[in-house]
Amino acid sequence: MLSGKVKIHLARALLKLAEGIDFDVVGGPAVGAVPLVEHMSIVSALEKDHTFDTFYVRSETKQHGTASSLYQAKKFNGNDTLIKNTKALIVEDTLTTGGSIQVALKAVEEIGAEVAGVLIVADRQDSDADWIRNQYDYRALFNVSNSGHLINPSAN
């Protein structure tokens, strides 16, 4: 588990990485994205006076309750967070082959929302995920080799 200070610094780094991306909401695959997007939302509200709603996408559809793979908080007016034409920033902790993030991207696009960008904390540089890097406004905090070493850390 990360300390509170590390979580704040990570949220700040992701918000800085997102600069220049026009987005309305932030979300990603459960479980990796949940703490990241929540911390980003809190830090942004407190330090930048910029608020945004969050969502996450489960890998499987719930069998009870909403019977949905998408979890999103309702706005005060009762509307869903993620709706058609919403600009969604997708966040994930690690990118290897892109399997889990593909589920989130598909859920966003099926609603009719736009993927504004994709942020990754650690990109493991697997060529199976090249389609994500090439198709979206893609940014990673760190690129990591198969052996676990940072690749070009000063370039990020």
Question: PLM features: what roles do these ranges have?
Answer:
Residues 1-92, 96-156:
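PRPP-associated nucleotide enzymes
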